[in-house]
Amino acid sequence: MNSVLNSGRTTICDAYNVVAHDPFSFEHKSLDTIQKEWMEWKRTDHSLYVAPVVGTVSSFLLKKVGSLIGKRILSELWGIIFPSGSTNLMQDILRETEQFLNQRLNTDTLARVNAELIGLQANIREFNQQVDNFLNPTQNPVPLSITSSVNTMQQLFLNRLPQFQIQGYQLLLLPLFAQAANMHLSFIRDVILNADEWGISAATLRTYRDYLRNYTRDYSNYCINTYQTAFRGLNTRLHDMLEFRTYMFLNVFEYVSIWSLFKYQSLMVSSGANLYASGSGPQQTQSFTAQNWPFLYSLFQVNSNYILSGISGTRLSITFPNIGGLPGSTTTHSLNSARVNYSGGVSSGLIGATNLNHNFNCSTVLPPLSTPFVRSWLDSGTDREGVATSTNWQTESFQTTLSLRCGASSARGNSNYFPDYFIRNISGVPLVIRNEDLTRPLHYNQIRNIESPSGTPGGARAYLVSVHNRKNNIYAANENGTMIHLAPEDYTGFTISPIHATQVNNQTRTFISEKFGNQGDSLRFEQSNTTARYTLRGNGSSYNLYLRVSSIGNSTIRVTINGRVYTVSNVNTTTNNDGVNDNGARFPDINIGNIVASDNTNVTLDINVTLNSGTPFDLMNIMFVPTNLPPLY
């Protein structure tokens, strides 16, 4: 953020130069730095109607889940969301959402919501003060417990949360609801973690453990259902579909995916949850509906386990004189055919034309793990010179952490960048997608050419999509181009996203399934005796290995690590689950057993699943939890 080049709202972030080689750069950043980066992002960078506080809050919560220090999250969260007691930032979120959705609250409802915001911040401030007074008493006798204040605050949350679920405005108010839910769940977690110090009885503690589980379930399901109802109604071009999804992920699902992890402490979350970006402009693709999304989603995610190194393609420039001998001409610059390249010599199928020789290669130049892509320019447009001459342009350009740029054309238009996110994959679509592709999602690591129907005017073109996520603790690439996950140097726990596998057998019956409350997507097994292998660089620490799974029917899980086999039989989550319905998956977190991540060694972890009932199985998260910090419920 030290230098800003104003060219189509382009920002070059030199701050990344400092942290490009640090696989735990996010964990090492201060909250103040994170706040400044999101403020700068909003000031100079992005066209999305997103208030910067939403990025700060998600980063703050992730850091607290990964820390042992934050026992009073609510107090700090109040200072971020309501600085100096002001509700302005929450009102900013509402105004931005109104602009994005082109919908407004009526006058009475707006007044009601603003009153609830004022009341909520005052209630939390008063509770925080009561806790401070209890911990630092200035009068006698000193109360033995703060249970009364805790129970009063709990009831106030229950009274105020429904005011952000008003009929007819559920989607518009969803970002505010998510923030209110953040505060309520943080409050409950604080009560559990501070029970001894606050004089909370064992019975009350059990009640609040149940609250954490139950309200995580209720709030997650509400957010997922509200989003999915809106998404199912979409019928729009790709840019608008992806922008809607990205907006809701930044404002809502970044939080939903953290809530189910609130039961853990000192757990560094290696997120596989993605933000997607595509270009805007007149030269864009067909319209899509929610029925097309399973294919599009599979196309964007299919090679997520590989280390991205760049793209290659065919760029063409063609000039035609105006018809009828009129003066002037039309020049078109376009990307015709594209292929995504990864470490280990792996490449995707072709996008667009399949019969053209590629004439450019765009790569990170330096090793992709040291200097990954962080920014994309994907717009297209038309420049006019007078009334007779025009130029149609298409960018498809990328920038690394060291500000090195490459692509089909020079960077221009709006750029796509999110603080602490890296471009971990690139995908794309042709002008029109064949129906036989739209109805057939790609299986895991499938290489398939995606082209327009024969004879489609402009069908050779490729329009790229950049895939952004926070995944950064990557040690190296395996020989096959997949990622080796790096365990933290200290005794902090960590996670591995199941879609980031080293290899999977039965690939034609294995798919990536979209999830919203899980810090990334699941690996869906549709054939029995499927094994997913993961590689991690160990740190010598001992962990309890938890697997988050969904098995609607009986399954058997066998985990092999360091030559030892762990077996869990009769896994059926139809009723034995945490209550969240995450896009059809119902999950608990299963304790597989105690394992050791051997020090300074590449450790393989094999997860084999037998489908005893023949029903699909979702592997949703892999969690290495410190042995001395069991889950809160």
Curated annotation (Swiss-Prot):
What GO molecular function terms would the record report?
signaling receptor binding; toxin activity
Q: Which SUPFAM superfamilies match?
A: delta-Endotoxin (insectocide), middle domain (SSF51096), delta-Endotoxin (insectocide), N-terminal domain (SSF56849), Galactose-binding domain-like (SSF49785)
Keywords linked to the UniProt accession: Sporulation, Toxin, Virulence
> What's a GO biological-process term for it?
sporulation resulting in formation of a cellular spore
> Other comments?
Toxic segment of the protein is located in the N-terminus.
Q: What does the sequence similarity comment in the record state about its family?
A: Belongs to the delta endotoxin family.
Entry function: Promotes colloidosmotic lysis by binding to the midgut epithelial cells of both dipteran (Aedes aegypti) and lepidopteran (Manduca sexta) larvae.
Name listed for the protein in its UniProt record: Pesticidal crystal protein Cry2Aa
| Source organism of this protein record | Bacillus thuringiensis subsp. kenyae
